[in-house]
């Protein structure tokens, strides 16, 4: 179950969580939960330093529901993953998208965005 997969993430058992999320995507390709599932799948890759797959999964989460609850965090995760892949221009543009598309959102703090911009030398 998705609850179990989230528990695995909380306990840093990313391989078990990843397996559940991947099976969910395969078994329920039209589910309305896919934006959430891809977000958490991205988190498993992120926590395993697999930046390319993390970036792809964050992008998939965002693309499936660009105005949804997970969209700001998915874009932010995408920006960090792109930065880790040394795609700094794209990472900085993606951070700007978080600010432009979701002004005043509470999912990603302004402090986190500014800190990440600084780390990526976006100025």
Question: Residue locations for each model-derived region?
Answer:
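Short solvent-exposed coil/turn linkers within tandem alpha-helical repeat scaffolds
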Residues: 27-33, 62-71, 100-111, 123
């Amino acid at each position: 179950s998705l609850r179990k997969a989230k528990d695995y993430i909380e306990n840093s058992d990313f391989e078990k969580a990843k397996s559940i999320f991947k099976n969910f995507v395969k078994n329920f390709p039209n589910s309305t939960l896919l934006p959430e599932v891809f977000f958490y799948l991205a988190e498993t890759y992120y926590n395993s330093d697999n930046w390319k797959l993390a970036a792809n999964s964050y992008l998939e989460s965002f693309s499936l529901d660009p105005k949804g609850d997970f969209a700001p965090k998915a874009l932010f995760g995408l920006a960090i993953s792109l930065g880790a892949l040394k795609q700094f221009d794209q990472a900085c543009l993606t951070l700007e998208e978080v600010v432009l598309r979701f002004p005043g959102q509470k999912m990603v703090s302004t402090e986190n965005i500014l800190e990440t911009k600084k780390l990526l030398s976006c100025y």
